Swiss-Prot record:
Transmembrane segments: none annotated. Pathway: Polyol metabolism; 1,2-propanediol degradation. The gene is pduC. Pfam families: Dehydratase_LU (PF02286). This is Propanediol dehydratase large subunit. Its cofactor is adenosylcob(III)alamin.
Amino acid sequence: MRSKRFEALAKRPVNQDGFVKEWIEEGFIAMESPNDPKPSIKIVNGAVTELDGKPVSEFDLIDHFIARYGINLNRAEEVMAMDSVKLANMLCDPNVKRSEIVPLTTAMTPAKIVEVVSHMNVVEMMMAMQKMRARRTPSQQAHVTNVKDNPVQIAADAAEGAWRGFDEQETTVAVARYAPFNAIALLVGSQVGRPGVLTQCSLEEATELKLGMLGHTCYAETISVYGTEPVFTDGDDTPWSKGFLASSYASRGLKMRFTSGSGSEVQMGYAEGKSMLYLEARCIYITKAAGVQGLQNGSVSCIGVPSAVPSGIRAVLAENLICSSLDLECASSNDQTFTHSDMRRTARLLMQFLPGTDFISSGYSAVPNYDNMFAGSNEDAEDFDDYNVIQRDLKVDGGLRPVREEDVIAIRNKAARALQAVFAGMGLPPITDEEVEAATYAHGSKDMPERNIVEDIKFAQEIINKNRNGLEVVKALAQGGFTDVAQDMLNIQKAKLTGDYLHTSAIIVGDGQVLSAVNDVNDYAGPATGYRLQGERWEEIKNIPGALDPNEID
């Protein structure tokens, strides 16, 4: 006979999750593997001759790249000789300024910085993250996708997402050739919701770069780097080729960051027996060495791997902290779904939500998860109210805000009509009034009429083949009567010329003002310092629609 309590527990959502015991030899260990190298560095005549116990004769491509470009050698020997526990204390001590820490962390080797953060528990890591994030003001990023690649729905959802507070929005495709329509719809909708929101379309790298050069996206993120050489070469890549791609984006005025995440090497079968965090540290150093301003990390689409082993979610926070400690923008994941448990996914979110990161999620699904083409997110559109209440409960700025239904309906309708004008002006397959009406009130693709997919794909490919650029979109908006949106779209193109939003951790706010680590420096130094939720922003977060006004109660 079974215990009734254990029968009840067996039915709990968390017991549908996958867990595995540590398997050190294959890399199924989140942190502190006995196979991780001991920190070391030797420098002869300004060149690294030993890195983390490995002589230069045994360096792989990643070692060479990091040794040449990724470490501040001027202070490396000094910092490597410092006690790691002392360095860990300095990281989480608010009395030690970020400006004092960065010269130390950027002079460490990957094994050294992993050793440092391994001395910290999650509360200490959150204390450190609050101080070490690059931009003073935390922010949020959204996923905006649907299973039908319906551009009208993407535009409406993007407008709502921007209205709710997302500063970056990302789409991808179910069908690769739909990409130009998705990119245009996302950018148009985002500018309707709030001018200045940055957008991207995650694709195969050549197409993604092409769309950026045509002016249909504002940034790129899914340029992946890995912590072992076989995973790199399996994808016909090297750290140098990724660095070249990064410079291609930057030279066109497009913001970009790399992507990596613990567990990717295990998933690809090339972990070389090292811990997930150590291999991820190598990815972060590759990013720094390539001169890229930021990184999306936090396991991202590999979250099922670290979350299955002990201390895995702690390791995810640790990799975010290492990223910020190397003075990089950190888009800290809270991305792909990994658990059936609401309690567990909230605990995972709080690691980044409470201290704040440059982008707490990368991204939060602004659509219901059944429409999320990034395989679902840790938070989706059905969590908006919960998220806003948690911000209010804890007085934490998580990047979003409460909204009114009538405002959302209006903004969705305007976005759908604006895209209708773009398609008409550019001679693309027409968007019907029925589609506009459906997108105005839709929750997801189940609420949308079908489009002629064959026609859409044909014309979408013409965008690429005929080099139809963002200025054509601006012209179509102006001719269609949406002069305000046309101006906002033009301003986004101008931003690529000025280049201000290429600075570390940049977002565009207000009337085109760029906030970045340059002019919004994180000055946290303990209580009453750094970013504080106050004034109009706190009033906005407090004012949730469900709150009763005592003055209006009879």
